[in-house]
Amino acid sequence: MIKKRIIPCLDVKDGRVVKGIQFKGLRDIGNPVDLAMYYNEAGADELVFLDISKTEEGHSLMLEVIEQTASRLFIPLTVGGGIQSLDDITQLLNHGADKVSLNSSALKNPQLIKQASDKFGRQCICIAIDSYYDPERKAHYCCTTGGKKMTNIKVYDWVQQVEQLGAGELLVTSMGHDGMKQGFDIEHLANIKSLVNIPIIASGGGGNAQHFVELFDQTDVSAGLAASILHDRETTVQSIKEVIRQGGIAVR
């Protein structure tokens, strides 16, 4: 049995870790390198850095953060946010990222997925999906620009397309659940998993350890992403894992 993973997510803006609720109202959490080291020691299986800087200076700071972090980190590091080209991916991997996460750029240019997968290997390419349920159209749609713009691309169509193009992993954020700490969007995640064979990281809604038990018990996703509950020190990676083990689920 493949063991489940717990992955802290750090949203980095202009060199600082921030966190909002449903992608709004950002507050400062701390220094990304320090936090990465804390999670490295605390039993995280991987780390995700999402660069939400708006400026070139912010993106440049991110490269420094990645380099400083990767040199001391013993777990895989995925970096996403603002990646537009193969050159951007090369730069991130050269600075120490193990995987890159593509979102808006892949929606605008799906061939970037194939080109990146061919050049760097499928295992390096994670596709991030900000999924928004539109009650009027009764369907989930992909959003771009940090969840600000809804596209006409349906999530269930997109996940199948990106797998065919060479994505090695999906990072699915249910926007209506993000930062709410009310539990994961189980039904939606299970539906996505039924359509693809690549691993899925679930994001949005993990408010306590029991939510992760439900996630792994009721879906076949590979990993759960956590931000708010870990950054606010409401619980720890090890505490979450202990509860998952007690639920009879294999975890790393």
Curated annotation (Swiss-Prot):
Signal peptide: none annotated. Its EC number is 4.3.2.10. It catalyses: 5-[(5-phospho-1-deoxy-D-ribulos-1-ylimino)methylamino]-1-(5-phospho-beta-D-ribosyl)imidazole-4-carboxamide + L-glutamine = D-erythro-1-(imidazol-4-yl)glycerol 3-phosphate + 5-amino-1-(5-phospho-beta-D-ribosyl)imidazole-4-carboxamide + L-glutamate + H(+). CDD domains: HisF. The active site is at 11, 130. Its main location: cytoplasm. One of its GO terms (biological process) is L-histidine biosynthetic process. It holds the Pfam family His_biosynth. Gene3D superfamilies: Aldolase class I. Disulfide bonds: none annotated. One of its GO terms (molecular function) is lyase activity. GO terms for cellular component: cytoplasm. It is found in: Cytoplasm. InterPro entries: Aldolase_TIM, His_biosynth, HisF, IGPS_HisA/HisF, RibuloseP-bd_barrel. Keywords: Amino-acid biosynthesis, Cytoplasm, Histidine biosynthesis, Lyase. Pathway: Amino-acid biosynthesis; L-histidine biosynthesis; L-histidine from 5-phospho-alpha-D-ribose 1-diphosphate: step 5/9. It comes from the Bacteria. Heterodimer of HisH and HisF. Belongs to the HisA/HisF family. IGPS catalyzes the conversion of PRFAR and glutamine to IGP, AICAR and glutamate. The HisF subunit catalyzes the cyclization activity that produces IGP and AICAR from PRFAR using the ammonia provided by the HisH subunit. This is Imidazole glycerol phosphate synthase subunit HisF.
